[in-house]
């Protein structure tokens, strides 16, 4: 058992295979005082597999300021983990304002690296990846998505976008529509 420095630990979680988590991440999850996560029900699958029982706070874009206020009394005197449902926290996930709040208060923040769907997709793409741009999720509005596609066409580097599984076909059709020239 190692005593953790008080502050915020941004811990990457597995993308699909629960065994893809580092020993360091497991050790820190075992030792933190509580865990901030997107979906407690989802996070419990991983935590139960690891035999970890901790208090969970749910964090979303719409409640981030509320969570920041709820944990103010713990900042600086607790070790707190932030995890996402899958992959690296803050990569198209909530948590930016939380991290900024810790940094602005000069409270320790560190990243525990691990799975990243952005990096995995780049590695498997067969495209040059020494220079790339990540755009996050495709905008919901078709006009905004079309603008993004046009912007990507103008770039001469590999680009990564997130598209929810149910929307891939529609997005590919939009790419074809915007690529006729």
Predicted features and spans:
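Glycine-rich, flexible N-terminal cofactor/catalytic loop recognition
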Residues: 1-62
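Beta-strand/loop-alpha-helix module characteristic of Rossmann-like adenine-cofactor folds
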Residues: 2-6, 119-181
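Short glycine-rich anion-binding loops that position phosphate/pyrophosphate groups of nucleotides
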Residues: 15-18, 85-89, 165-167
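Short active-site oxyanion
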Residues: 29-35, 107-109, 158-159
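Alpha-helix capping/helix-boundary segments
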Residues: 41-43, 117, 167
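Conserved helicase motor
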Residues: 57-65, 137-142
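Short amphipathic alpha-helix with an adjacent loop that forms part of the alpha/beta core around
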Residues: 68-76
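Short glycine-cluster motifs
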Residues: 76-135
């Amino acid at each position: 058992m190692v005593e953790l420095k008080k502050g915020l630990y941004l811990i990457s979680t597995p993308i699909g295979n629960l065994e893809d988590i580092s020993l360091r991440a497991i050790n820190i999850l075992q030792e933190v005082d509580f865990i901030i996560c997107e979906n407690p029900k989802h996070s419990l699958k991983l935590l139960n597999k690891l035999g970890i029982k901790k208090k969970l706070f749910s964090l979303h874009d719409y409640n981030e300021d509320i969570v920041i206020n709820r944990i103010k009394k713990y900042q600086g005197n607790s070790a707190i983990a932030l995890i996402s449902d899958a992959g690296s926290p803050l990569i198209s996930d909530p948590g930016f304002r939380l991290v900024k709040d810790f940094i602005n208060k000069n409270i320790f923040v560190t990243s525990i690296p691990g799975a990243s769907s952005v990096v995995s997709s780049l590695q498997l793409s067969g495209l040059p990846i020494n220079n790339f741009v990540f755009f996050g999720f495709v905008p919901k509005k078709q006009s905004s998505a079309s603008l993004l596609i046009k912007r990507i066409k103008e770039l001469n580097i590999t680009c990564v976008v997130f598209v929810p599984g149910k929307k891939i076909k529609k997005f590919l059709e939009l790419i074809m529509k915007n690529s006729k020239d």
